[in-house]
Amino acid sequence: NSKSQMDKDYYQLQAVLEAERRDRGHDSEKIGDLQARITSLQEEVKHLKHNLERVEGERKEAQDMLNHSEKEKNNLEIDLNYKLKSLQQRLEQEVNEHKVTKARLTDKHQSIEEAKSVAMCEMEKKLKEERDAREKAENRVVQIEKQCSMLDVDLKQSQQKLEHLIENKDRMEDEVKNLTLQLEQESNKRLLLQNELKTQAFEADNLKGLEKQMKQEINTLLEAKRLLEFELAQLTKQYRGNEGQMRELQDQLEAEQYFSTLYKTQVKELKEEIEEKNRENLKKIQELQSEKETLATQLDLAETKAESEQLARGLLEEQYFELTQESKKAASRNRQEITDKDHTLSRLEETNSMLTKDIELLRKENEELTDKMRKAEEEYKLKKEEEINILKAAFEKNINTERTLKTQAVNKLAEIMNRKDFKIDRKKANTQDLRKKKKKK
């Protein structure tokens, strides 16, 4: 029974070792696949990083162009609206002033009409120039809007590329997580193999205990054999003593037969007693012989059992030695595989940390680019506001200059007209004096 159990344990250990070899080959193949997959993922990450940098640069350029175009558009609209309002105000002011001047100078000389026509021509010329400038600005606005629409399309394409890159990054993170899960599963398998090795070591210890127990049983059987041999020797000695007594009795009986027949009755009685004793002794001898035979058979069985146990023990020792060697080899291989897997796991963890650092750097670079764009937009707004304020101040200065020049021109025109009126009045006075002198004559 113990031998069959040992054979069963031996076959189970062989099956476990074979399964462990298969798992080791499968694990090595899986590690090779994982390493190839990691290298391909690293190449893909480098390619995606390069594409992300290129798309980020294109997006930045497109965003800068779009912001610049929008700012130019807004500035042109503001300038055009401001110029249009100022021109309308100037036109209204000129019309009002013209009406006032026309009302005041209806009776004035033709020079006023000429000055008015000249002023109107100048105003019409200025209005025409303003209209041309407005049309040019509107055409420029249309072109800028077209450029803005094209830049919007480019920006949408860049955003789509960026979203695609983000999806690829998420997919790669999922793949890294799956690889981490696979590594955890490999670690669990490694722990299971270690537990199985511990179980095998425990079974080997149990086999050692069984071997000790069998040795104790063999020693007990040898002690019982020695005791039985001692009892058999004692019984043989007793049988020999009984045989000697029987011979002595027979000798006495023959001597008494020779000496006297009177003692026949006694001899018969003694003979009967002797026969009874002989029968008892024979019975005892037969019993002792049967016990001797049973003891001999038991001894033979014990010897055969001891020999078979010794052979089984030798086989078990050989199997145990082989299993121990195989277990040591498997343990060393398993340790080597565990160290290889640990190295692979550390490399994968380093790769994962490097990928995470690269993604974090890309994210930081994106945030820095966004901050730089925001700061550039704010600086551009401030610069544009300063330019607008400068242009506004220059325009107001030009308007004030034009107003002063216009006021000076009107004053000069009024002065000229007053001089002409004075000359006309003087001529009238002279003509009246001449008429009076002629009448007096």
Curated annotation (Swiss-Prot):
Transmembrane portions of the chain: none
Cystine pairs: none
Protein activity control: Activated by RHOA binding.
GO biological process: actin cytoskeleton organization; actomyosin structure organization; cortical actin cytoskeleton organization; embryonic morphogenesis; mitotic cytokinesis; myoblast migration; podocyte cell migration; polar body extrusion after meiotic divisions
Described purpose of this protein according to its UniProt entry: Protein kinase which is a key regulator of the actin cytoskeleton and cell polarity. Involved in regulation of smooth muscle contraction, actin cytoskeleton organization, stress fiber and focal adhesion formation, neurite retraction, cell adhesion and motility via phosphorylation of DAPK3, GFAP, LIMK1, LIMK2, MYL9/MLC2, TPPP, PFN1 and PPP1R12A. Phosphorylates FHOD1 and acts synergistically with it to promote SRC-dependent non-apoptotic plasma membrane blebbing. Phosphorylates JIP3 and regulates the recruitment of JNK to JIP3 upon UVB-induced stress.
Compartments, as annotated in UniProt: Cytoplasm; Golgi apparatus membrane; Cytoplasm, Cytoskeleton, Microtubule organizing center, Centrosome, Centriole; Cell projection, Bleb
Domain RhoBD positions: 356-422
GO CC terms in record: bleb; centriole; cytoplasm; cytoplasmic stress granule; cytoskeleton; Golgi membrane; lamellipodium; plasma membrane
Enzyme class at the top of the EC tree: transferase
Subunit structure: Homodimer. Interacts with RHOA (activated by GTP), RHOB, RHOC, GEM, MYLC2B, RHOE, PPP1R12A, LIMK1, LIMK2, TSG101, CHORDC1, DAPK3, PFN1, PTEN and JIP3. Interacts with FHOD1 in a Src-dependent manner. Interacts with ITGB1BP1 (via N-terminus and PTB domain). Interacts with SHROOM3.
Catalytic activity reported: L-seryl-[protein] + ATP = O-phospho-L-seryl-[protein] + ADP + H(+); L-threonyl-[protein] + ATP = O-phospho-L-threonyl-[protein] + ADP + H(+)
PROSITE patterns, per the entry: RHO_BD (PS51859)
Alphabetical UniProt keywords: ATP-binding, Cell membrane, Cell projection, Coiled coil, Cytoplasm, Cytoskeleton, Golgi apparatus, Kinase, Magnesium, Membrane, Nucleotide-binding, Serine/threonine-protein kinase, Transferase
Listed EC numbers: 2.7.11.1
Protein name, UniProt field: Rho-associated protein kinase 1
Region (SHROOM3 binding) location: 114-353
Cofactor(s) needed for function: Mg(2+)
Coiled coil: 1-99, 418-441
Family stated for the protein in its record: Belongs to the protein kinase superfamily. AGC Ser/Thr protein kinase family.
GO molecular function: ATP binding; protein serine kinase activity; protein serine/threonine kinase activity; Rho-dependent protein serine/threonine kinase activity; small GTPase binding
Recorded topology in the membrane: Peripheral membrane protein
Taxonomic source organism: Bos taurus
